[in-house]
């Protein structure tokens, strides 16, 4: 299986399955001399981990990360950083009834077509459990970006089902189980989630991530545009079916006179482009959105086939999230951080001596 690595200079390679012994990753390209402990990574892992509220899967994994290499006397050495998280709450028996059945809407059918076999226990490698290691690696990038460049990366839920959420107050995001920035909508989200759990169904969501303090000049035209790499990273997250940068698909209804981000001596007058022009960061906030489908792991009966070609009706048993978008927030932050750190290192390697007299805001 290829495709387990992201990045060029800051490279993250993950391994492990949902019901295997452990998850792990190798992080290459971290500069030496950066103070780093397991506690630096644990905060974001705790935000992502399952079983933390009644609105998410009740699989209870502590997700305690172990640093295996690349750290000496509390600082990075510049060598590969190895990270490991043990799986401790597997219930593989929950999946024995579906070992020969393809769950509709899941990767069961496509994995079997590609490899001729699959790990049916919780989806194996296709499970969102894998993203725990992305969050751990992303926490390294977030720390580097914040301490060396003053870059802040934040994410939140901006829609659940047909409930839109305004970014009214970032401080509220960590104060509720939905990562919701709109305190006026908490009760509506709670009511929707209760209804979904009662019905045994699920719902989709929209997540927004914002990076502030990103310098102008990041991005490598033409095939490694910054927005292309961000879209690639976000699309790699489980259940994501669409990504927008800036105003995204809303620009279809705009005219050029409305959409262009005009510039005065005081700076940009708007940010429809989401902080990226021509594939290169403009120095404005980088804004990206991603749409996540409703999970197919539900108890509402549905039609499918088994590996023998027979039609069957099935429900998905086990412990699942009614809305996978909730726990996707720290994952999206991590993926954005990984991309930005990679491009910062690439910019430093090629253009460290570039100086311009063009204003920066």
Swiss-Prot record:
Cofactors, names only: FMNH2
EC number annotated for this UniProt entry: 4.2.3.5
Reaction equation(s) it catalyzes: 5-O-(1-carboxyvinyl)-3-phosphoshikimate = chorismate + phosphate
Annotated keywords: Amino-acid biosynthesis, Aromatic amino acid biosynthesis, FAD, Flavoprotein, FMN, Lyase, NADP
Binding, NADP(+): 48, 54
Spans traversing the lipid bilayer: none
GO biological process, one term: aromatic amino acid family biosynthetic process
GO molecular function: chorismate synthase activity; FMN binding
Co-factor binding comment: Reduced FMN (FMNH(2)).
Entry similarity comment: Belongs to the chorismate synthase family.
Assembly, per entry: Homotetramer.
Function of the protein: This reaction introduces a second double bond into the aromatic ring system.
Annotated protein name in UniProt: Chorismate synthase
Native organism: Escherichia coli O7:K1 (strain IAI39 / ExPEC)
């Amino acid at each position: 299986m290829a495709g387990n690595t992201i990045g060029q200079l800051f490279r993250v390679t993950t391994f492990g399955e949902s019901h295997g012994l452990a998850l792990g990753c190798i992080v290459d390209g971290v500069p030496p001399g950066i103070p780093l402990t397991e506690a630096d990574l644990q905060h974001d892992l705790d935000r992502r981990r399952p079983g933390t509220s009644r609105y998410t899967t009740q699989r209870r994994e502590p997700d305690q990360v172990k640093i295996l290499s690349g750290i000496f006397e509390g600082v990075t050495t510049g060598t590969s950083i190895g990270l490991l998280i043990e799986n401790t709450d597997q219930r593989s028996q929950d999946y024995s009834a579906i070992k020969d059945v393809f769950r509709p809407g899941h990767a069961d059918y496509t994995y079997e077509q590609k490899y001729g076999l699959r790990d049916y226990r919780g989806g194996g490698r296709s499970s969102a459990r894998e993203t725990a290691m992305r969050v751990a690696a992303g926490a390294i990038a977030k720390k580097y970006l914040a301490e060396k460049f003053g870059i802040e990366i934040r994410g939140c839920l901006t829609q659940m089902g047909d409930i839109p959420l305004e970014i009214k107050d970032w401080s509220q995001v960590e104060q509720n189980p939905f990562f919701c920035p709109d305190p006026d909508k908490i009760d509506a989200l709670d009511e929707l989630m209760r209804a979904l759990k009662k019905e045994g169904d699920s719902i989709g969501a929209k997540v927004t991530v914002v990076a502030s303090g990103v310098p102008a000049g990041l991005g490598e035209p033409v095939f490694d545009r910054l927005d292309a790499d961000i879209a690639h990273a976000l699309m790699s997250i489980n259940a994501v079916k669409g990504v927008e940068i800036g105003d995204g698909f809303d620009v279809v209804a705009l005219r050029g006179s409305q959409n262009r981000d005009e510039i005065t001596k005081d700076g940009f007058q708007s940010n429809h482009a989401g902080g990226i022009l021509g594939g290169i960061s403009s120095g404005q906030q980088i804004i990206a959105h991603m749409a996540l489908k409703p999970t197919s792991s539900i108890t509402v009966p549905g039609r499918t086939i088994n590996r023998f070609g027979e039609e069957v009706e099935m429900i998905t048993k086990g412990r699942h999230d009614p809305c996978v978008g909730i726990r996707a927030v720290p994952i999206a932050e991590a993926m954005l951080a990984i991309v930005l750190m990679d491009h910062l290192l690439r910019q430093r390697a090629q253009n460290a001596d570039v100086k311009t007299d063009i204003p920066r805001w």
